[in-house]
Amino acid sequence: MAIKKEAAVKQFLALFHTAALDLAKIRAALAPDARWQPVVPLANVVYGADAICREAERQYRIYKDCDCELLNIASAGDTVFTERVDRVRLLDGDKEIITNVAGVFTVDDDNRIVFWREYWDMLDIADQIGVSGETMREMMDTQVEV
């Protein structure tokens, strides 16, 4: 059971290793009532698979590619924990941004993501981009209606 949930998370993360998101595949990997909190605790929770896809699409307007290097994965029950190094290349200036991320995923019995939380240092990213913490907060504020 745990291996299948971990595999579902690995497959889900692999969908983001691209310049153009396949929103149909992302939506299929999510439970209809899934939730996503892109930056715990600062960003608002995004509710629903369609809203999550819209928010992911919005974020992909900022960068042109993404790579999630999975360092560690573990699970307990329906929860999968990941330790990653994420790299994105910004559209504006072609700058590469690298950050350490702890992702926590709740996975249902159908191996779909029902709750996705990401923990990373927003100020580290702000420093790499060259913006203030407040500007970074505004950039990461989820833009979808809840």
Regions found by a protein language model. Give the residues of each.
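Short acidic-aromatic low-complexity motifs
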Residues: 2-32
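A beta-strand edge to alpha-helix "cap/lid" segment located at domain peripheries
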Residues: 4, 59-146
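Hydrophobic alpha-helical core bundles mediating ligand binding, dimerization, or RNAP-core interactions
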Residues: 9, 13-16, 30, 56-59, ...
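Hydrophobic pocket/interface hotspot
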Residues: 12, 25-27, 34, 48, ...
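A general structural-boundary detector
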Residues: 13, 39, 91-92
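Short, flexible active-site loop motifs that bind/organize anionic cofactors or intermediates
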Residues: 16, 42, 115
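A solvent-exposed, acidic/Ser-Thr-rich amphipathic alpha-helical stretch
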Residues: 23-77
